[in-house]
Amino acid sequence: MKKVLTLTALSTLLLSTSAMAAGFHLREQSAAAQGNAFAGATAGAENGSYAYYNAAGLTRQKGLQVNLGATYIAPRATAKNVMSENGTRGADVENVVHAAVSPNGTVSYQLNDRAFAAIAVNSPFGMITKYDRDWIGSDHGITSDLKSGTITPMFAYKATDKLSLGAGVQMQYVWAHLTSSHNYSRTGLVTENGNDFDMGYQLGAMYEFSDATRVGVGYRSKIDHKLKGKMKSSGSALITSDNPDYAGAGMQANALMNQKISAKLTTPAMLSMGVYHDINEKWAVMAEYQRVFWSSFQNLTFVGDRLNKPTGNIAQVKENWRDTNFYSIGTSYMLDNQWKLRLGLAYDQSAVRYAHRTPRIPDSDRIWYSMGLGYQYNENLSFDMGYTYIKAHSAKMNSAVTKNEGSHVSADYSNSVKVFAFSVNYAF
């Protein structure tokens, strides 16, 4: 009997994230930057929403300004050629990843000629996935729902006429809801819920070579979460006295699986560098590089409080994620005094290599194609719209290669996503 119960819990949060962004990061925090595929996001500072990428850019926001936005993420993920470990062919799975809305907002205020403050609200990590209850890989996950909310007070200071510095405190809440079937017989349902609050920081710098050219560097720290919650099980009893890994004779599944649980989840550190240049009064070009330190996510250990094992581990999944690179280039063009056109192209590297790709994380590299519009309604009020089509490379997955516990399942994944972003900015 396999000793793992299918409680690879938080791994199923990451199911089919290849259709959205590398890992489970939601890069989409600015409608204006969306139009340029986030090229120059750490140097652009067109409005307060750019402070998510670099707090130092606040020194370009004069007076009191409010930016409110939302991003609608509409992914499409399909699993084909689904096979079980005994060679049984499963049905293709359509629309695994569900659409979601990621809100964002920033209020910035100029304290004096050199000091600036702001508070930002973002949802930087999250996703929703749902498989059919009877799909072949149901023990690897059925429903996965991850939500996050981050409030970041920020401060920026114009150290010289050319150099600006910024910093912020990330206060982050994470909530997760997951379901899967028992991996012994795939009868019954396991439900896990957990949440946590923890803190991190962000740092930034911006240097303006001239009125036309500037560069920026931004860093967001990792945040180590320990999600705590409950696990509940419904269905037939599956644990018997001949299983030495669990508590003594006669222990039943419901007795073992209705318990308190915890799991560690780290949201990764990110380092970004960007450049922005005005070629003339109408035309600007920009570029961005971002390093996401996903290597902090090597193993996922899920701990329960009713095991007779020394560690209390219900399951340990080897993730072995790698650090990733994101590259983007973009351009903007003023069509007239009110309308601005934005274009961008990006390459987004996957955190998961083939040897570690699982049904929970069929991630792959992707290309971003972006465009957007900015509209200056009057001196105080402006609007931004962004659209991105993301095409992920095809991803072959065979869980037997990963050597993790649980049933074996293989599939070919095809993923894409459409992203629509809108924001309004008002300067008082």
Functional labels for PLM-detected ranges:
Residues 33, 48-49, 63-74, 102-104, ...:
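A common structural microfeature
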Residues 14-15, 66, 396:
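Hydrophobic alpha-helical membrane context
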Residues 12-14, 58, 107, 208:
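A general structural signal for short secondary-structure junctions and capping/turn motifs
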Residues 63, 81-86:
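Glycine-rich loop at the start of a catalytic domain that most often binds anionic cofactors/ligands
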Residues 22-37, 41, 84-92, 99-428:
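Outer-membrane beta-barrel porins/channels
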Residues 41-46, 51-64, 107-111:
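Outer-membrane beta-barrel pore proteins
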